[in-house]
Amino acid sequence: CGHGHPNEATTIIEIAKTQEQHCFDGTTSAVVIAGELLKRSEELVDQNVHPTVICEGFRLASDKAVELIDTHGSGVDQKMLTEVAKTALTGKSTGAVKEFLSDISVKAVLSVAQEDAEGAMVDLDDIKVQKKQGGSIRDSTLVDGIILDKERVHSGMPRSVTNAKIALVNSAIEVKKTEVDAKIQITDPNMLSQFLDEEEQFLRNLVDKIVESGANTVICQKGIDDLAQHYMSKSGIFAIRRAKKSDMEALSKATGGRIVNNLDDLSEGDLGIASKVEERKIGDSDMVFVEGCPQAKSVSVLLRGGTEHVVDEVKRAFEDAIGVVAVAHEDGAVLTGGGSVIAALSRDLRLFAESTGGREQMAIEAFSSALEVIPRTLAENAGLDPVNTIIDLRKAHSEGKSTYGVNVYQGGVVDMAKAKVFEPSRVVEQAIQSASETAVMILRIDD
């Protein structure tokens, strides 16, 4: 059963990816358990246990573990979700503002969650996470709506509009150049002023159309002529130009407005609504906030931080946190962390192995002890003696203290429920399944 197969490395990389996709966490666990299962399977092969029997035992053990995970879980409320977020943020450079960021992440997830009879569904695309260097992390905000990295086109325009009626325009608000780029022969000064008057009148008409529709806010995907800007500001209209296509679509969804390609077609029915559109100074630049959108399925989070590096770190940590909170909210169950549940499952599987006859029993026992690689690794990372830690952990679990695990930050075996270290059950479930499937696949290759 000589390992070192070229496919093994790629397979292990694959499980890491699957784990990341499904759970945003626990990638290391999946890979570490898979490696340990392979080590144990070699020992079994040396004792003349056939790979097919090992595969069957691993499968039985994995299924049993997944079935038993629920017995170790507890229900989820908002407070519990905050603890899950805090656990995800622990040990990252955002440590000091953990409480603050975990609150924002839970609020963001709960405001986009769709609830139905079967439970909750969270689409993380509905949380737009933006970062802006400057200020401190505590200046980060959650906005019920959309943030545009833009400023109004003319300083004479209002900085803020309440009860915004928004025209979403996908054409330039400027004079259309004559189709044939003819040099217009202007021989007489009167002709020039007449020509300019016509341009002016054309732009004035365009702005009148906007005013007639009832719009007081214009978000334009293309350019806006200087003169048109001037007329708009005279009419008290707030306007942005060159908005991103993705922002236009998000605005359309949130405000209920329709994107029009031609101002001639603009009518009141096309307008989107928001309770407020406002330009605010964020750091060194201005950004526009569109808030209180009636159909907003999405929220925006603006993350701040003193340097580029800090903002990037905060964004990475925050995205992990919302990912894990979303999973916990969808599953409606969380587990205590620190390897506590893995240790409990290891004990459960030892008992399960005793009730199983046949040679699979050895494989289930091997699976049970392979799981202990997780608390062992945690102990090593915390600078604790791994052997003593496992002994302490087994002792605690044999006394029914099934929430005891390894606390990396305080060092030692403690009650993880008291230490408030929690993770979604899906993370542990997926890690065990992925590890088992990978080990079985590689055993088959070598069989």
Residue ranges and their predicted role:
Residues C1-E36:
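N-terminal cofactor/phosphate-binding cores enriched in small/glycine residues
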Residues G4-P6, S298-L302, G306-D447:
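Extended, low-charge hydrophobic alpha-helical regions
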Residues A9, E20, E56, L68, ...:
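Metallocofactor- and cofactor-centric catalytic cores in central/energy metabolism, strongly enriched
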Residues Q21-A30, E43, Q47-A61, A65:
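Hydrophobic, well-structured modules enriched for small/aliphatic residues and gly/pro motifs
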Residues C23-V31, K177-T178, D225-L227, M248-E249, ...:
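Short glycine/serine/threonine-rich phosphate/pyrophosphate-binding segments
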Residues T27, V31-V32, T52-R59, Q361-S369, ...:
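Alpha-helical transmembrane segments of multi-pass membrane proteins, especially transporters
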Residues S29, G75-A85, M121-Q130, D385-V408:
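Glycine/charge-rich, flexible interdomain linkers and switch-proximal surface loops
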Residues L60-G306, E313:
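Extended amphipathic alpha-helical scaffolds
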